[in-house]
Amino acid sequence: MAAGFNWFLVLSSVFLCNLVKTFLPSISSFLSKIFHKDADQEMEMRTEIQNMKMELSTISMMDEFARYARLERKINKMTDQLKTLVKSRTAQQAKMKWIVNIAFYILQAALMISLILKYYADPVTVVPSKWIAPLERLVAFPSGVAGGVGITCWLVVCNKVVALILQAVS
């Protein structure tokens, strides 16, 4: 692996995963807006409530108490329906966000496991043994090559470096 550009494949995979992870909230919000179109009904209900409140402000409570009370009950009922609708939409958005996150992390884990299995025996790169002397066996795992950097260590380092770079950029 050290001779070719496979290290670049691993690095670009890690970069892409971290980039997608950065935009995950936006992606899940976009998907929830596509799948749940309740916003139009909510807007209708809000405008209807506003109209009824305007009408309520024109009615004298002393002169037309029965009409005033009916309209007030109607407003309260519609407000409760709106709250229920908003609560339902919020729950659906949370569920969509949870599903998108779980799907992403499953795909990311599958990608990382496939990279580890593919490059299990080969070092990603070979450096002088003195550079990594105290941790040489740990860094070389699972390849076991002296002075080699194994795929697991490479993935951990790449994930951390890419995450720090993306955090600094955003």
Curated annotation (Swiss-Prot):
Membrane topology value: Multi-pass membrane protein
GO cellular component: endoplasmic reticulum; endoplasmic reticulum membrane; GET complex
Segments crossing the lipid bilayer: 7-27, 97-117, 138-158
Disulfide bonds: none
GO molecular function terms attached to this record: protein-membrane adaptor activity
Entry-linked Pfam families: CHD5
Stretches of the chain found on the membrane's Cytoplasmic side: 28-96, 159-170
InterPro entries (UniProt xref): Get1 (IPR028945), Helix_hairpin_bin_sf (IPR029012)
Record keyword Coiled coil present: yes
Lumenal side: 1-6, 118-137
Similarity comment: family membership: Belongs to the WRB/GET1 family.
Function: Required for the post-translational delivery of tail-anchored (TA) proteins to the endoplasmic reticulum (ER). Together with CAMLG/GET2, acts as a membrane receptor for soluble GET3/TRC40, which recognizes and selectively binds the transmembrane domain of TA proteins in the cytosol. Required to ensure correct topology and ER insertion of CAMLG.
Identification of the protein by name: Guided entry of tail-anchored proteins factor 1
Source organism (scientific name): Danio rerio
Gene name for this UniProt entry: get1
